[in-house]
Every structure is written in structure tokens, then in C-alpha cells.
């Protein structure tokens, strides 16, 4: 997550010798890369379309609509649209922005004479993001993205000097590895189910299960918990989230510890890292600033949709045909990473064309404000949703059907689009961006915009 990557860093006392005074100045409005802000804003709001499912329904329903939330009529249609157009695509755009932010932060610092001293600022920023992510995951919502982004950020810094070609090739190799892992996982699931069924037959025959049989049975049960959990497990999850803050905290802690473990984390980390590398390459080639030609963006959009949408639609149709059977899904979803990257890049191209054309200015200005406050808005999603769905709030967990959750999304979008530009009329940063920056430099940063700057800001927003 890189919500303030479009602004120059400000110097901490301990880094003053390495970072010259100009870096202390906030980046003037004229220097903002608004296209990147708009892209980040679109990605952030789009991510909520997916995250709302994990906020409002049992976690297995995110992938498998037969678990909860309805799997027919408008609910199945909602799942279908979600999978084909959105699932993983919005996160991909957000990861692109994070990678671009690495290039922005480091290149601006180095151009202003910071040299390798920018590494000090970069790693302090990243470590604070890591801490924010841990707190967010355990205290508010297990589906946190800050922690894995920070982990990726720790190893992104050395890649900043590499050529766009090398970055893109590395990203393509990671996507290929992830595709191979999905196929391998399918064979693993098939073998695990076979061994679990054998253990079940042994138990029914009254024979004592071996250690291998016990392990096979448990491994398969763990797989089903994530894709097709038994009704009693679903009910327990619902009860936990509708209960007290403590019961929800215990459930969150269990999920977070599982998701932070190696088996769950490597595919997700590689997925994010690949897109961050693409973002770094695209930033170097001016793709994310709407500076490439119309032909370039049109070709990217056309090719991305032509390649990605049919692949995604076929996988969705096959999933429905097998009724989301766990053993079949890894084979069906083998094309997931290819399809999501293709469609995400097409979405990117469309957004860049809108910005380039100067169309929908009333909306893009608000999206840019949402993007500039991405950290604050991201956490606002978690706070609002936890109060709507969990027992220490309204307790609406698992009470909405899948399609109905999107009405909640619309209200949160409205809040972000209204609140963000109003806040930025008066302050340089969002509240959490300011906190993050102050912690990074271990010095309270200027927050309020001076009156003359505020007037310029307002005039700029109201001008055509």
C-alpha cells in the first residue's frame, strides 16, 4: 500500500545530513501525478467490492457461493461478474501502484541528492507499514493487505535500478510459477482426498487408523474448511463474528496466524510481488502517468480484454458446472493468474485513457483525492465494515445475500468520494498518512494547509 507515494518525503532529524532540505517540502499540487492518484483511488474502491464478501459472509463464501450468501439468481450473477471482471484485478492495480510508489519515492530522493540515504527513509517507512498491518490484521480485520505489502517492500528496494525489461520478465516468470503451482495443488488435492477416503473406509471397518491416515484426514478437512466447510463450522464462524469483540478477536487471530504461515503466504506474496515489479517497470516507461499514446493504451485495453475475459469466463462457467467441487477448482483456476493480469492491465489502460481525455473531471478529481488518502480510506473500510457486520456493532454478519452487500459498498464509496476531497482542502495528508509520515521521520509533520494554499486548492477543484 503506497498512499503517499506521489509526494516527496520529508526529512527526519537523524537523516538530515543525508537528505537535503528541499525534500522536507510537500510536493506542490502541480507536481502531483494525478493519473497515478486516480488509478490508486479506483483500485482502492474496487478492492472493497471483493473485501466486502469476506467482511459480510463466512470466508469460504468468497470463493464458493454455495457456502453462504446465495448461489442462484442475482447472487450467482454477482459471483460471475465478480470473478470475471474483479477478482484479483483490483488488487493487481493496487499492487501496480505500490511498485510505482517505490520508484517515485526513491527516484525523487536520489534526484534531490539523497543518494543511498533514501534507503534509510524507505526501510523505516516500510517497517512502520509492517507494524500497521499486524495491528490491523489482529485488531480489526484478518484480510489485511498492509503486512504482505510491507514484506514485499522489504525486498523491492534493490530492484529499483533494474531495467523495465528485466522487471517484466521476472514478473512473467513469477506468474508462470504460480500457474504451475495451481496445477500441482490440484494433483495434491486429488491425492489428499483419496487418502482421506481410505482413512474413512478404515474407520468404518473398525480398524485403528495409522498416523498417516490421521494426518491425511486432517489435511483434507483443513482444505475443506477453506473451500467447502461443513455446516457446523460455518455456524461457528457466524456465531463468533456476531458475538463479542473478544470472540471476533479470537477468530481473527486464528485466521491471521494461518494466513501468515508459509503454505498460505508464498502464493499470495509471489502474486503481489509480480504485479509490483510490473508497476515499477510501467512507472519507468510512463505507462502509469497517462503519457503514452492513445494507440498504446487502446491496444493494451483491447488485447487485455480479448485474452483475459474469455479465460476468466470459461473458468467461472466450469466452476459452476462442477458445483465448486474442491478437487476440480485448482485445475479450473490454473488460468486465474494469467486472466487476472490481462484484465487488470486492460482496466489500467481504460483508466489512463479517461484521465488522458480529461473526461469525467468531477469524478476523477474525487478519485484522485481517494487515492491520495488511500491508507486512511483503506482502514476506514475496515472500521465501517466491522461496525456494520460484527456483534460489537450492528451484527449483520451473514444476514445479507451476496448481491445485497454491494449496496453497503455503494454507501462506503459515497463516503470516501465526499470525505476525501473535503479533508484535502484543509490538510496536506490523510490522518493516517500524516501519522505514518511523522513516525517515519520521528518528527511531527506539518498537517494543516495555509489559508492561501487552501484557497488555491478550492479554486483548482471548482475550475473546469
Language-model segments: which ranges?
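Alpha-helical transmembrane segments and their immediate juxtamembrane cytosolic regions
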Residues: 2-464
